[in-house]
């Protein structure tokens, strides 16, 4: 949790609740071309075996040792400035690259680093404004560019890095929007589906019947399906039209017990990851409602800040960081047991 970015990320709520923000931009066709990533080169990956950033190396031992499973992680929206005219991020810009490493890699992707060899591709993600209906037409084109990069990255990952290992797909926010499309095209009902340990599709609505063959998982050691959730402060809702479109009816997994429990006491909470990289266990109670995980205000030094807001989208993963880490390791272990490895 990185305090300087709390309000930047929280701006997503403004879009989906209809608040007006004035953005400077230009027609998509007039956007300057951004150099495409080349996933055969390590410079196009934020994280790849042999290129583990020091800022996450403390999360596990033997960082140079190859694991028996892989993790493909897609990070959330990071470019959101109202004065930024670009439709897609320039992944060659050092500030953007540093943001990827110091925000989602450090506080989100790190939850899966003990589960498998971590792969995080840089991609020309779409600017936050694409989720505003005012920019819908050009926004779709920007999202298509982002997906094209991730599609190329996943193909290269499977054909050149994976070597037939089982894998996890994990994502957040815009990353989940793309992950759903990626799974539909390459995994669901395809030959490699049997290699999917689990998909953690966080921070974006995922319908129960999103895929033809992959189904929501409802036990902590289940494999071959997906989990999903969106987090809000307890007893709080977004605006009605927002709730109906972005939340209601979406799969809502329990990110503490990973079963069908509707309410979970803080005594079972394994721990959240705070901005100083300290773990705070037994910090929150949760309750599942239609399309959302309701969380109590976390018991930590930033409690006052959390009490002032209702949308916990920006900490969908951080709040359950240890719970995710331990569950992912369990599912990896279970995959190998069930497949007689």
Give the label of every model feature segment.
Residues 70-74, 119-122, 168, 198-201, ...:
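Structural recognition of the beta-strand scaffold that forms the well-ordered cores
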Residues 24-30, 76-165, 301-318, 322, ...:
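Active-site catalytic motif of lipid deacylating hydrolases and related acyltransferases
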Residues 19-105:
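Flexible, membrane-associating and regulatory peripheral segments of lipid-active enzymes
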Residues 3-4, 61-64, 109-112, 189-191, ...:
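A general structural signal for short secondary-structure junctions and capping/turn motifs
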Residues 20-21, 151-163, 185-304, 308-320, ...:
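Surface cap/lid and interfacial helix-loop subdomains adjacent to catalytic sites
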Residues 1-23:
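Bacterial Sec-dependent N-terminal signal peptides
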Residues 171, 175:
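Gly/Ala-rich beta-loop-alpha elbow adjacent to hydrolase catalytic centers
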Residues 178-182:
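Hydrolases whose catalytic domains are alpha/beta-hydrolase-1, hotdog thioesterase
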């Amino acid at each position: 949790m990185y305090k300087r970015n709390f309000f930047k990320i929280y701006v997503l709520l403004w879009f989906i609740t209809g608040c007006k923000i004035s953005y400077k931009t230009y027609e998509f066709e007039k956007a300057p071309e951004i150099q495409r990533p080349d996933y055969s080169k390590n410079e196009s990956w934020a994280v790849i075996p042999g290129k583990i950033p020091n800022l996450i190396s403390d999360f596990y031992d033997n960082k140079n040792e190859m694991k028996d499973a892989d993790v493909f992680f897609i990070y959330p929206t990071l470019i959101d400035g109202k004065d930024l005219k670009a439709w897609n991020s320039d992944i060659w810009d050092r500030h953007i690259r540093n943001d990827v490493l110091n925000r989602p890699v450090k506080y989100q992707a790190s939850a899966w680093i003990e589960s498998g060899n971590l792969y995080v591709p840089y991609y020309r993600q779409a600017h936050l404004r694409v989720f505003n209906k005012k920019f819908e037409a050009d926004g779709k084109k920007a999202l298509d560019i982002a997906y094209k990069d991730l599609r190329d990255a996943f193909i290269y990952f499977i054909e050149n890095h994976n070597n037939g290992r089982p894998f996890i797909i994990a994502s957040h926010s815009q990353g989940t929007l793309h992950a759903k499309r990626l799974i539909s095209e390459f995994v669901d009902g395809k030959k490699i589906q049997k290699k999917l340990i689990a998909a953690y599709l966080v921070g974006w609505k995922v319908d129960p019947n999103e895929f033809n063959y992959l189904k929501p998982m409802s036990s902590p050691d289940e494999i071959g399906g997906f989990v999903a959730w969106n987090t809000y402060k307890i007893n709080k809702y977004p605006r009605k039209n927002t709730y109906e479109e972005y939340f209601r009816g979406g799969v809502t997994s329990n990110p503490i017990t990973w079963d069908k429990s509707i309410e979970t006491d803080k005594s079972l909470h394994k721990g959240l990851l705070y901005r100083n990289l300290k773990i705070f266990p037994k910090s929150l109670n949760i309750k599942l409602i239609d399309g959302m995980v309701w969380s109590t205000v976390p018991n930590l030094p930033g409690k006052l800040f959390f009490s002032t807001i209702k949308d916990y989208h920006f900490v969908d993963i951080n709040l359950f960081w240890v719970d995710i880490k331990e569950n992912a390791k369990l599912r990896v272990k279970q995959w190998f047991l069930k497949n007689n490895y």
